[in-house]
Every structure is written in structure tokens, then in C-alpha cells.
Amino acid sequence: DTIVTPEFPTAFQSVSIRLDSNTIDLNHYIIQWSVDEFEEKSGMGARDFSIAAGAYGSRKRIVATINGNGVTVKKNIILAPQDATVLWEAIDSYVPPFYRGKKLPGNESLIKISALPNFRVDNDSLKLDNAVYLWTRNDNRILNIGGYAKDSIIIEHNKLRAAEKITVDVSDVNNSTRAQKTVVIPIINPQIHWYYKNDNNYRKLSSIDRGLRVTSGNVLLVSEPYFFSTKDYASDLNYSWKVNKETLYLEPGSSKKELLVQNPG
């Protein structure tokens, strides 16, 4: 057996190769290592070999030749580092229209994960629809989802987990070029951030989560929910306002996320 660590090296990464056998004792055989037909190492029982991978899209052909007792065995290893990018976003996570960041998932959110292979072979790039994708979730292979041109998946967060670990194996149709990428998606609690509108009914985009000092006049507070899993923001979210632990009832037709606070002074 030939053990390559890591199995999917990145560009210029150090790679360790080890030969193992259950039938012969390799410690009593001369093992010669060559890279692209140039000998790099040779010795009795030289089962281990280290090498640095090349740039993305490059290929190194490593041959381990085992000699002894009138027997010659060759093992071929190809190092062809490739890269892939994994992108993710919560589909049903609510954020305000002015929010420019990523939609983060909360409990039981729907999450879309997409893979982008950055393969280069002979100066040609691998097309998204000409690759094979195998998906793993929390170290368990996802069945009936991956395959040819299946470059994205949608999962629902398991509420018993604090994060979702997703791994994708990407290869060309001949399985001669491969890459593996893992991403850990954190699950966060929904949040509420506070804003206010000025006298011209203009909302300040900076939050006032640390408090707001009002010296005169009234202030219109705005509560903005973030990262709630909801299909219909308008109907799925309920608001309950309290001041000093006393429930307030808003006037019919008024915005349920705004509260006019009058300054008695």
C-alpha cells in the first residue's frame, strides 16, 4: 500500500509518502525513489519519502522501485495539487435591506453550499458542469445528492449541532484530478439591533446598541431583527414591546418594529 499524507495536497505543501506491505518485509528490500525520472533517494528499507508539491496545475510523477530476492515492484504516485472554493449562505435568514454582510444561519436554517473547482490541467480550467462532486456532512457521506455537475447542495441545520461541517470532493470525469475542501459553518443565535430615526424620518445606519442619550424632543426607536429563519418576514415575526417590564400595545396600523419614545422633559 502507498500512503500519501495529506491525501489532497495544496500548492507547495510538504507531502509524506510511505510504503506498507502485509505480505513482505520492506525493511529487507532496497527501495529507490525517483521524481520525474530523476533519482532522489535510495536505500535498504527506505520506505518513507518527503517532497514538496508544485504549483496548482503542476504534476510530479514519483516512482518507488522495490528490489530484492529477484523481485522488482514499482509504485507510481502522481502529485497534482488542485484547489477548490466552498461558498455558503443561509437562504431563509432574515437581514434588513441595508445589511451588506453574509446571511448567517440560525437554528434549523436552510443553508446553501456551493463548490467552485479551481482546477488547471495543461493550462485549461475545469468547467463547473464537467466535474463530479461528492458531499460529506459531519463526516457522513450524503447519499443521492452528489454526482456529475452537482456543484451545490441545500441542507437544513440540525438543531442539535453548534456547527455544520461540510466536505466536498471534486474530481474530473476521469478521476485523474481531484481536490478536497472542508468548511465549518457556525450556527449563531438570532439578534436584535437598535436604530433610531431623526426628525426627518431618516434612519441612522449605525446601531445604538450601547444606548442613546436623548436631551430633548422625541425619538423613534427601530428594532431590526437579524438571522431569524423565516420564509415570510412580514407574517412570521411577532413583536412584543415592554418598558420597565410593562407591555405596550401599539396603535393599529403602526409599524410593529418602531416605537415612538416621548421625552417628558
Give the residues covered by each predicted segment.
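Solenoidal tandem-repeat scaffolds enriched in leucines and small polar residues
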Residues: 102-171
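Surface-exposed, flexible coil segments in extracellular/virion-facing regions
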Residues: 34-51, 136-155, 243-261
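Conserved structural position at the C-terminal beta-strand
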Residues: 64-68, 170-172
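Short, compositionally biased P/S/T/A/G/V-rich stretches that sit at domain boundaries
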Residues: 1-9, 76-105, 183-214
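Short, surface-exposed loop/turn segments at beta-strand-coil junctions that are enriched for proline
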Residues: 52-57, 156-160, 260-265
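A short beta-strand segment in extracellular, disulfide-stabilized domains
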Residues: 11-22, 104, 108-119, 123-124, ...
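Solvent-exposed loop segments of extracellular immunoglobulin-like
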Residues: 25-32, 124-134, 232-240
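Exposed beta-strand face motif in extracellular beta-rich ectodomains
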Residues: 58-62, 162-166, 219, 265
